[in-house]
């Protein structure tokens, strides 16, 4: 068995993966604001404690870690969402954990999992997007990640969709993820509705479901869908995939957002090549995709 770990901008999830690629046990926690001030210590202490506990229950052969950001070998070169640079997480963990450790970009991990056992397993050419704190992605061709050489590539979240737009944490302006990440949608809803920052995603989802025709909610959701449509259409025009999968916390909102997205792309005629059917599907593995894919 293997241990898969998914590091997000606001959470850590650790799962034990069996030989069929499925999770048999999982532990997770949200990162508190005070923990984010010393993010490296918070990450390492939580991983070390739980890996040691799980090793007592299961025979573990290796560890895979899914991380948002640019990875080179076992080093996190830059993670905007975690706020770290040149962070050799694997090296630090090996001081306490005697197991092979590999680290990959989280969106690529999720894409691998969805293409092997999830929503994209029936397609040879697909694109996978993770919409959460930021936006990540990957291109899958014949069951394999698109080879981008020494650099990670597929940084879809930092595709510019608005000239001189909102400042991104990466330093550029107008990045896709500043407009179309789930964090952007939630923040805009809170601001428009005068809600506190502590208002959780589930509460916002309930508001959209119950009051979808409210003018403020309708406007915010409509603007969000339009920005998301532009980015997704750009990717379709470039790669012409058979299908697109969307994961991250978008999955929880898919019943109120997915059809709007597909209809908007078709109605606005953003696609260069017309399609009879636009296949955009929610991730079948949910937020577990990163955990599972990190071990593939």
Language-model features: locations:
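ATP-binding/phosphotransfer module of carbohydrate and carboxylate kinases, centering on a glycine-rich
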Residues: 1-62, 71-76, 91-101, 116-123, ...
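Active-site flanking residues adjacent to catalytic metal/cofactor-binding acidic residues
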Residues: 5, 105, 149
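Short clusters of small/polar residues that mark proteolytic maturation junctions
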Residues: 27-29, 81, 150
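A charged helix-plus-loop insertion that forms the helical arch/lid used to bind
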Residues: 76-86
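Short loop/edge segments at beta-strand edges and connector loops
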Residues: 103-107, 111
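Active-site glycine-centered loops adjacent to acidic/histidine catalytic or metal-binding residues
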Residues: 106, 132, 294
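Glycine-rich phosphate-binding loop of actin/hexokinase-like ATP-binding domains
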Residues: 121-179
């Amino acid at each position: 068995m293997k241990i898969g770990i998914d590091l997000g901008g606001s959470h850590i999830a650790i799962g034990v993966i069996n030989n069929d690629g499925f999770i048999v046990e999982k532990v997770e926690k949200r990162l508190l604001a005070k923990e984010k001030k010393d993010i490296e210590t918070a990450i390492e202490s939580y991983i070390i404690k739980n890996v040691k506990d799980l090793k007592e229950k299961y025979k573990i052969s290796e560890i895979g870690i899914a991380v948002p950001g640019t990875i080179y070998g076992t080093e996190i070169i830059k993670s905007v969402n975690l706020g770290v640079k040149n962070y050799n997480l694997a090296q630090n963990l090996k001081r306490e954990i005697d197991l092979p450790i590999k680290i990959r970009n989280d969106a690529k991990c999720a894409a691998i999992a969805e293409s092997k056992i999830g929503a994209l397993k029936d397609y040879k050419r697909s694109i996978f997007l993770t919409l959460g704190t930021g936006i990540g992605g990957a291109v899958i061709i014949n069951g394999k990640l698109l080879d981008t050489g020494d650099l990670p590539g597929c940084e879809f979240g930092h595709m510019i969709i608005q000239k001189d737009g909102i400042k991104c944490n990466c330093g550029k302006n107008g990045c896709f993820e500043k407009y179309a990440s789930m964090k952007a949608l939630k923040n805009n809803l809170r601001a428009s509705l005068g809600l506190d920052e502590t208002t959780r995603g589930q509460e916002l989802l309930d508001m959209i479901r119950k009051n979808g025709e409210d003018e403020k909610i309708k406007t915010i959701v409509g603007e969000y869908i339009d920005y998301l449509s532009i980015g997704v259409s750009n990717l379709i025009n470039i790669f012409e995939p058979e299908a697109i999968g969307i994961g991250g916390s978008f999955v929880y909102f898919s019943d109120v957002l997915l059809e709007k997205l597909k209809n908007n792309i078709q109605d606005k005629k953003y696609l260069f090549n017309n399609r009879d059917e636009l296949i955009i599907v929610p991730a079948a593995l949910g937020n577990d995709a990163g955990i599972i894919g990190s071990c593939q």
